[in-house]
Amino acid sequence: MMRNLKTFRALALATLLATTASAGSAGAVDISLLRFFGECNTEYGTVTDISKANGECGIITVLTNKFNAENTLGAKVVTQTVEWGAYYDQLTATYSTGNIPDVAVMHASVMPNFSGRDLLTPLSGPLKELGIPSDDFVPAALKNATANGEIYALPFDLHALLFHVNMDLMKQANMANPDGSPMLPKSADELIAQGKKFKEATGKPFIASESQSAEGMMVRFFDTLMWQQGVDVVSADGKAASIDTPEGLNAAKLISAIYSEGLANPALDYPGSEQAFLNGEAGILLNGTWGVDNYDSQAKSGKAALKSYRVANVPQLFANQKVWADSHMWVIPKDENRSAEKTKAAEAFLKFLYDNNYEWSRTGHLSVRQSVLDSAAFKALPHRNEFAATATNATALPQVQNQRAVYNAMITDLNAMWLTGTEPQAALSAMQAGVERVLRRNR
């Protein structure tokens, strides 16, 4: 595995040097990078050894440092970090202020809002010139980055919802299989039954999840349950919603019961849900692939109450094995005033990120490169075999505009079931009406 890993990193460095050397005419130039993933310069501000980085913030920070230290263009990436919730409003505002970033991170679910308004630089040609083969991208990732036959983004990952599991607590509740894996439910009724059994045995909530209307973690779970029943929340043309349906009521009743039966703490925000899990206060954390590296490191450190950590695909509770997913991608926002030198440097940075996609996959995200997924180094990463099926089960809303607005419209009304006692049917009706208002923009 170490030989394979060293080969990955050597190839990445060699390609960086070759790429930047061939673009040497660009000269020394600063380029701006707008991103979320947090700020961690105190820990990683001067680190260039990627093997010492962990987590999303650590890995992207060190990758940026490494590019700045090693590229032969003399290019320097200057990073501006934005809090996740405000990110897309701030990115949109840059088109009015003129401070358009040279590179920006973007979710696949948001890209249609920008590509549909001609706000992104087409990348099919540049990626080909940089030697990035489109056939190395897994189909779902390439689809996410494409609109009307043109590639507008460099895919960076597929990320999805997972069950993060405290196996010590599961064993305490007699909910561990002989092979050491967690005993997970196979139906909605079984999930509630297991949750009650777990709570009785441990005195703790079965599930920890962000529940305070900021992240909308349960909206992702609701979408998952809808897809598992064969229903798309939004139609393929982005003009109709299918929320207030029998399938929607099944999903809403299950989520409502998780809270009404005391199987989850409704007071937890996102950091609180993670802390509860790390403190050994819940059996399962409902969160994404992005947490795997962090939780594994914390469990191994001996400093957290969480000691025995495992990962599981979100279980199939209905007819189909599906799970909510999205992608992080990198774009070059369109700017008619950007110099050729800045464009070359931005493209070189994208090539560097592509070459180091394995490093990003250490976060827990699934690589978008088939060559990385097939590698021994990737397969040897902690827990990857435990959620391998997620790559196949990953499902997203159609590539239509206003996906993020649909998501936001659902959060408040769904969360009202446990925050204000709204009945599931009333929550469904409100979600349907709210999403329909958003989708009128697509007509």
Where do the language-model regions lie?
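Extracytoplasmic/periplasmic solute-binding protein
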Residues: 29-32, 148-156, 161, 188-240, ...
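Short, solvent-exposed loop/beta-turn-alpha elements that line the ligand-binding surface or hinge
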Residues: 124-137, 180-184, 206-214, 229-250, ...
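Conserved N-terminal structural module of periplasmic/extracytoplasmic solute-binding proteins
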Residues: 24-113, 135, 318, 426, ...
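Long, aromatic- and glycine/proline-rich binding clefts that accommodate carbohydrate-like moieties
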Residues: 309-314, 361-416, 441-442
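Periplasmic-binding protein-like
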Residues: 171, 202, 350-372
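Glycine-centered hinge/linker elements that transmit conformational signals in sensory
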Residues: 190-197, 236-267
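Extracytoplasmic/periplasmic substrate-binding proteins
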Residues: 34-35, 220-229, 249-341
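Hinge/lid segment of periplasmic solute-binding proteins
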Residues: 108-162, 190-194, 218-221, 306-312
